Regions:
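Bacterial N-terminal signal peptides
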Residues: 7-17
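Active-site loop->helix "elbow" adjoining a glycine-rich segment at hydrolase catalytic centers
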Residues: 132-133, 186-190, 218-221
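Alpha/beta-hydrolase fold nucleophile elbow
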Residues: 206-217
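Short glycine-enriched nucleophile-adjacent loop
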Residues: 221-232
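A conserved short beta-strand
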Residues: 234-246
Length: 248
């Protein structure tokens, strides 16, 4: 089963879209390291937790800063996707590809889909996906990156938002001075923070933190290539699938 799952992923991951799903019922709350989250069951039986925060909103004093840990009181209602990260205006001829979504700086959220049979500590394989868009556009909330179809095949599917454009990649001498000698890789740090969230919490959703594969599309594949070589990502994933990245 697992061999079939991993072997078919590269050919099929970009086709894993699903129609709008009717919500059948809410899910019992799950306690994560940051706080309690409540998801929902889709019409297919797939369990979904949408718009789960993995870092504090990167606004005001946290703009152009590494992502910071977040915690909350009460129950976070993870029943809808959150706004995409701020990005450049897309050409009209590709709007049909990405779709129209709300945008905002408060965008460091991830989405989790799990099979209907998943329970805490089921130890199912986990796929973490990073979206493409050249580092200037893209969204974890895009319908073409929806994880419902993959969850129906037996895997936990997670996609992670990260900052884009000038908010994700700007290096500046003053920022470098403030941040101890480096600046300009906030998007990469977001990608790492989301992956660490998966490592720390995915078992509670039915995933196996010792069986995590990372993958992505276009710029997302570039993120995967970076994480393969990143010392800070050591131990956070066990497999990587590089599907496509443009050279230069």
């Amino acid at each position: 089963m697992k061999a079939t799952l991993w072997g078919g992923l590269c050919a099929g991951v970009l086709l894993l879209t699903s129609a709008s799903a009717q919500v059948l019922k809410p899910l019992p709350p799950i306690r994560t390291a940051s706080g309690v989250v409540a998801g929902k069951v889709l019409a297919s039986g797939v369990k979904a937790w949408l718009g789960v925060p993995f870092a504090k909103p990167p606004v005001n004093d946290l703009r152009w800063m590494p992502p910071q840990p977040i915690a909350w009181q009460g129950v976070w209602n993870a029943d809808r996707k959150m706004p995409e990260c701020m990005q450049v205006l897309r050409p009209h001829d590709i709007n049909h590809y990405f779709g129209e979504e709300a945008t905002g700086e408060d965008c460091l959220y991830l989405n989790v889909w799990a099979p209907a049979r998943a329970t805490a500590y089921s130890k199912l394989p986990v796929i973490v996906f990073y979206y493409g868009g050249g580092g200037t556009i893209g969204s974890a909330g895009s319908g073409m990156y929806d994880g419902e179809a993959m969850a129906k095949k037996g895997a936990i599917f997670v996609n992670i938002a990260y900052r884009l454009g000038i908010l994700g990649y700007m290096a500046h001498p003053e920022l470098t001075r403030e941040q101890g000698g480096h600046s300009g890789n906030y998007a990469g740090l977001d990608q790492l923070a989301g992956l660490k969230w998966v490592h720390d919490n995915i078992a509670r959703f039915g995933g196996d933190p010792a069986h995590v594969a990372i993958t992505g599309q276009s710029a997302g594949t570039g993120a995967v290539s970076t994480l393969i070589h990143a010392p800070l990502a050591k131990g956070l994933f066990q497999q990587a699938m590089v599907e496509f990245v443009e050279d230069g």
